[in-house]
A protein has these predicted regions:
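Secretory targeting and sorting signals
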Residues: 1-42
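N-terminal carbohydrate-binding accessory modules
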Residues: 38-39, 47-136
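Surface-exposed, active-site-proximal loop segments in enzymatic domains
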Residues: 95-101, 105-110, 143-168, 194-211, ...
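Extracellular glycoside hydrolase catalytic/binding regions
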Residues: 107-114, 118, 208-210, 214-235, ...
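An active-site-proximal structural segment forming one wall of the substrate-binding cleft
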Residues: 109-137, 145-147, 153-235, 262-270
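Aromatic-rich peripheral "rim/lid" segments of glycoside hydrolase catalytic domains that contact
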Residues: 389-480
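Lectin-type carbohydrate-recognition ectodomains
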Residues: 477-653
Length: 653
């Protein structure tokens, strides 16, 4: 979320300075990510619009993923052409009377419900969304909304009297119901903890800022269960713009209370247990470090996913997200001057070619097919100041950035869709695509004077993949660096199968095909997956199933029984402890080959996730896509420490 501070690009919270003990400055952080550069494109001069009836008939919920694409229940591409309808996260900027427009973003007092309901009937707002060519809506909320029992002022819903006397959550319910009834897909977005306009040091920096992780998860389960029967509520966007607080950075995979990777994965799997139909949207780290000329600072976005991606119990439910704004940069907070301002380049400073490369490096690389990290990338926030803006660099950036989205056929959500106009008809927030004055009169993107219209229509009307998307093969990594990674629904429902050891379990539809040597990481796939057989899964801790000759003389071996394949493993420190083996429905070959990786990587020349590193800094062994992992050899000799040295790979047929 960006601020309305003057100039438009600068967030007001940069005025605050971190305590001297933190040796820092306030962090205000904008969006993240795009893709490769595109040549100028041409498109219709108006957005392609559907009626609610047409939009509802064009897709069927729930949504899932196939590789880099989101698809509907029929397997047809559903490209998110979305907007952000802000307000329910709060517009108060943190000081003074919460009801004073001067203390709210752009003078807009949302009363903690989506903006515009005081001045325009809900049906008209939705019709205007259709006119923009949107098919989906990111709907921010604060955790405070869930627990708020107060009723909104009548004036806050003056144009929608049916909403009088309702709590903010009940108004949110009504908005969700209206959106989905009119054909829109809705993605719930946990934007803030408290009612507060993001960002900076506002007490909302992480999922567990101003609340516990347990409360955050409980709130998500409440929201998911609340809308579970509405299959047009398609996704849970876990948290907005995770960033540094006064004292510490968020991280990706460190195993502590600030570990976004672990927190998001746990929450995502709990959400899928409550509603297996939901998409789980994970935005990368928006900011780390202290922005000065002498201290480290950066905007990581999705870059950590390259070597440490998330694995959910459902491999077809993960979507990654990123935010991009012209005035921010890979290491630039967006501050114009004073605290937080550095000389690092902004996204608007890059040439089209440079911007395309940066956006790819920070986000769109995730869409590369056949890797452990492959998933759709949703640019869930981007935007620019429109009517009245004279910022040539931002305008050039917007043109170049939308070209990138077009070229890469990228899912997107503009920030924000709805704002207010003042008594003179001027937008109070000129980033909004639609502005309504106190009488309900609309000033929209399609009205004369908004320079963004051509690029918006280019984006909305751009050629895209449509129709059926072919099923894809999945590769997913397991990370036992700091504890178990159990993404098997079956095993989650059972007891501890390797007590006292760290355990990794593949999703129920996948098998284990690779291990890292010394870091306890693993790789799963469903490539050529054999049909699952009946019977118990077997925990193997010794050599009792080595029945077709000693395939690794002098080494300890863990080998699955005949006609079973490895689906999990356990380790103590980094030494092998056990294999978990699942039965196949039909007999499996018992001949195979050894894949030794004690002196270097031994991975297929082609095939799954071979172009990406799921265990950086360690040797990796990996069976081919048409093989199953039947055994692991290890030794305590020669200071090997019991880490895996070889895999027994057998053909699937």
């Amino acid at each position: 979320m960006r601020s309305d501070s003057s100039p438009p690009a600068v967030r007001s919270s940069f005025a605050r300075i971190l305590p001297a003990a933190a040796a820092a400055v306030t962090l205000v952080l904008g969006g993240t990510s795009a893709s490769a550069a595109a040549p100028p494109t041409t498109a219709s001069t108006t957005a392609s619009a559907m009626t609610g009836t047409q939009l509802a008939a064009s897709w069927t919920g729930p949504l899932s993923t196939r590789g880099r694409y989101i698809v509907d229940a029929n397997g047809d591409r559903f490209k998110l052409k979305a907007g952000n309808w802000a307000g329910a996260q709060g517009t108060w900027e943190g000081s003074g009377d919460v009801n004073d427009p001067a203390n709210n973003q752009a003078g807009q007092v949302s009363h903690n419900i989506p903006l515009g309901l005081d001045r325009t009937p809900l049906t008209q707002i939705l019709a205007d969304f259709h006119g923009l060519g949107l098919n989906s809506m990111r709907l921010p909320f604060a955790n405070a909304l869930i627990h708020d029992t107060s009723t909104v002022p009548d004036a806050a819903v003056a144009a929608n009297p049916q909403l009088k006397g309702k709590t903010p959550l009940q108004v949110y319910d009504a908005v969700v119901a209206a959106l989905t009834a009119d054909g829109f897909a809705v993605i719930l977005n946990n934007h803030t903890t408290t009612y507060r306009f993001c960002c900076g040091l506002d007490g909302n920096e992480r999922w567990n800022s101003s609340q516990s992780t347990e409360q955050w998860e409980a709130d998500w389960l409440f929201m998911v269960q609340r809308y579970r029967t509405n299959k047009r509520v398609v996704g849970a966007d876990l948290r907005n713009e995770v960033r540094r607080d006064t004292w510490d950075n968020p991280n990706w995979g460190w195993g502590d209370s600030h570990d976004e990777y672990a927190a998001f994965e746990e929450a995502g799997n709990r959400i899928l247990a409550a509603d297996p139909d939901m998409l789980v949207v994970m935005e990368g780290i928006n900011w780390s470090g202290i922005p000065t000329a002498i201290t480290w600072h950066e905007r990581p976005m999705l870059t950590p996913v390259r070597n440490l991606s998330n694995t959910l119990v459902r491999s077809d439910k993960l979507v990654y997200a990123a935010h991009f704004y012209a005035y921010t940069g890979p290491a630039n907070t967006g501050a114009e001057s004073g605290p937080g301002s550095t000389s690092d380049p902004r996204y608007q400073d890059f040439t089209p070619e440079q911007l395309a490369q940066v956006v790819n490096d920070e986000a769109l690389f995730v869409t590369q097919s056949g890797q452990h990290f492959t998933a759709p990338v949703w640019i869930s926030e981007f935007g620019a100041a429109g009517r009245g803006s004279t910022n040539a660099k931002e305008q050039a950036w917007f043109h170049n950035f939308t070209d990138i989205l077009v070229k890469n056929d990228t899912d997107f959500a503009q920030w924000p869709v709805v704002g207010w106009s003042d008594a003179n008809g001027n937008p109070q927030d000129n980033w909004a695509l639609l502005s309504y004055d106190a009488t309900g009169k609309r000033l929209g993107l399609g009205d004369p004077g908004d320079w963004r219209a051509a690029d918006w229509n280019k984006l909305i009307n751009a050629p895209s993949l449509t129709g059926p998307v072919a099923p894809v093969t999945h590769w997913n990594m397991l990370d036992l660096d700091f504890g178990d990674q159990n993404v098997s629904t079956r095993m989650l429902a059972q007891g501890d199968w390797s007590n006292g050891n760290r355990k990794g379990n593949c999703p129920d539809t996948e098998r284990l095909v690779g291990l890292g040597r010394g870091d306890s990481r693993g790789l799963c796939t469903d490539a050529g997956q054999p049909a699952a057989g009946a019977g118990d899964w077997v925990t193997v801790t010794d050599e009792r199933y080595v029945t077709h000759g000693d395939w690794a003389p002098g080494y300890n071996k863990l080998q699955c029984p005949d006609n079973t394949y490895a689906v999990g493993y356990s380790a103590h420190s980094n030494a092998m402890s056990a294999l978990l083996c699942a039965p196949a429905a039909a007999p499996l070959p018992t001949t195979g080959r050894n894949a030794w990786f004690d002196h270097g990587d031994n991975r297929p020349a082609t095939g799954g996730s071979t172009a990406s590193d799921w265990a950086p800094g360690y040797y990796k062994g990996q069976c081919a896509d048409n093989e199953y992992l039947a055994g692991v050899a290890y030794t305590w000799k020669w200071n090997h420490g019991g880490v895996p040295d070889a895999l027994l790979c057998r053909p699937l047929s």
